[in-house]
Structure formats: structure tokens, C-alpha cells
Amino acid sequence: MGFLEINWTSAAMLMLFVLMVYFLNKFLYTPFIEMAEKRRKKVEEDLKSAEQLKEEAEKMRSEAERFLSEARQRADEIVESARKEAEAIVEEAREKAKKEAQNIVESAKTQIEVEYKKALEQVQERAAELSVILATKLLQKVFQDERARREYLVKILKEEIEKS
């Protein structure tokens, strides 16, 4: 048998090897590669989805922080407004009380002045009465005579009328 003789056993083995590679490729390797590719794509999609969720979560967190900041700012503004309003109310009450106190003081001063004038008039009236009584008694002692007393009173009245 020569060098170029065909060994049918080796040819059959080669043929079986090629068939085995073909079937392994078709039924094992190709489905495995497809499954691995699908898994890779699924992992990539999951990673993209996770990244999107992370971005959305970050947006929501920043939006929540912004809302919280705005709420704090509004609360601070409300507190400041309430404080200013309270100060204004206190100041208004203070001014009102001050005006009322001034009115009371003015009223008291006016009342005191009226009472003082009344008292002064009463004192003057009483002094005039006492003066008349005193003058009458003095004149009675000085002028025992009724006629002399009348002449003296007429003289004084004439002088007073001339002065007026």
C-alpha cells in the first residue's frame, strides 16, 4: 500500500469529527453564543436602566432639596412677616396707650385748672365777703354815727365808680 492510499478509518474519523464540529456549532456553540449575547445585552440594558433610575433619583433628590429650600425660605418669610406684624401691633398699642395717657393727663390738667379756678373764685368770694364784714365792723367802730358811716360809704363808692 502506498503513500497515497486512503485510509477509510481516518477518513471516517475525519468525517465524524467534521460532523461533530458542525452539530456542536449548530446545537451547542451558536445557542451558547446567542444566549451569552442576549445576557450581555440584558446586562447593558439593566445598567442603562439603573443609570436612568439613578439620574431620575438624583433629579428627584435635587428637586426635593429645592422644594425643601423654598419651603424653608417661605417659612422664614412668614415668620419674619409675623414678627414685623407683631412689632407693628405692639408699636400701635404703645402709641395708642401713649395717646390715651396724654389725653388722661390733659384731661386731668384741665380738670385741675377748672377746680383751681373754682377754688380761686370761692376764695375770692369768701375774701370779698370777709372784707365786707371786716370793713363793716371796722366802720362801725370808727363811725359810731350812722350818718357819718353812710357819707363815708357814698364817698368810697363814688371813687370806685370814677375809677371804673
From Swiss-Prot:
The keyword Cell inner membrane applies. Keywords: ATP synthesis, Cell inner membrane, Cell membrane, CF(0), Hydrogen ion transport, Ion transport, Membrane, Transmembrane, Transmembrane helix, Transport. The chain crosses the membrane at residues 10-32. Its main location: membrane. GO terms for cellular component: plasma membrane; proton-transporting ATP synthase complex. GO terms for molecular function: proton-transporting ATP synthase activity, rotational mechanism; proton-transporting ATPase activity, rotational mechanism. It is found in: Cell inner membrane. It is a single-pass membrane protein. It holds the Pfam family ATP-synt_B. InterPro entries: ATP_synth_B-like_membr_sf (IPR028987), ATP_synth_b/b'su_bac/chlpt (IPR002146), ATP_synth_F0_bsu_bac (IPR005864), ATP_synthase_B_chain (IPR050059). Belongs to the ATPase B chain family. F-type ATPases have 2 components, F(1) - the catalytic core - and F(0) - the membrane proton channel. F(1) has five subunits: alpha(3), beta(3), gamma(1), delta(1), epsilon(1). F(0) has three main subunits: a(1), b(2) and c(10-14). The alpha and beta chains form an alternating ring which encloses part of the gamma chain. F(1) is attached to F(0) by a central stalk formed by the gamma and epsilon chains, while a peripheral stalk is formed by the delta and b chains. F(1)F(0) ATP synthase produces ATP from ADP in the presence of a proton or sodium gradient. F-type ATPases consist of two structural domains, F(1) containing the extramembraneous catalytic core and F(0) containing the membrane proton channel, linked together by a central stalk and a peripheral stalk. During catalysis, ATP synthesis in the catalytic domain of F(1) is coupled via a rotary mechanism of the central stalk subunits to proton translocation. Component of the F(0) channel, it forms part of the peripheral stalk, linking F(1) to F(0). PANTHER family: ATP SYNTHASE SUBUNIT B, ATP SYNTHASE SUBUNIT B', CHLOROPLASTIC. This is ATP synthase subunit b. The lineage of its organism: Bacteria, Thermotogati, Thermotogota, Thermotogae, Thermotogales.
